[in-house]
């Protein structure tokens, strides 16, 4: 037995369930992706001047290691 009948068609909700609805689900607007930040230009020519002294020391240390032994 039905629980309740509406008197008019306007009393019914427009969408009763998303699963039973014939309308497609609205898609959210696509957000633009962030661009990568531009890299800073190196000012000095020497490693100690531009802050790359530690990076160069690591490269030299890796080259001097046991990798050269025969």
From Swiss-Prot:
GO molecular function: double-stranded DNA binding; nucleic acid binding; nucleosomal DNA binding
Pfam families per record: HMG14_17
Organism: Oncorhynchus mykiss
Annotated site location: Cleavage: 67-68
UniProt keyword Nucleus present: yes
Lineage: superkingdom: Eukaryota
InterPro entries recorded: HMGN_fam (IPR000079)
Coarse class of the protein's main subcellular location: nucleus
A GO biological-process term: defense response to Gram-negative bacterium
Compositionally biased intervals (Basic and acidic residues): 46-57
Protein family membership: Belongs to the HMGN family.
Protein's name in the database: Non-histone chromosomal protein H6
Comp. bias (Basic residues): 30-45
Gene Ontology cellular component annotations, sorted alphabetically: chromatin; extracellular region; nucleus
């Amino acid at each position: 037995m039905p629980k309740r009948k509406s008197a008019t068609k306007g009393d019914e909700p427009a969408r009763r369930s998303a699963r039973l609805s014939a309308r497609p689900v609205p898609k959210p607007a696509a957000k633009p992706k962030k661009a990568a930040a531009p890299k800073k230009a190196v000012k000095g020519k020497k490693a100690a001047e531009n802050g790359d002294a530690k990076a160069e020391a690591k490269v030299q240390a890796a080259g001097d290691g046991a990798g050269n032994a025969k």
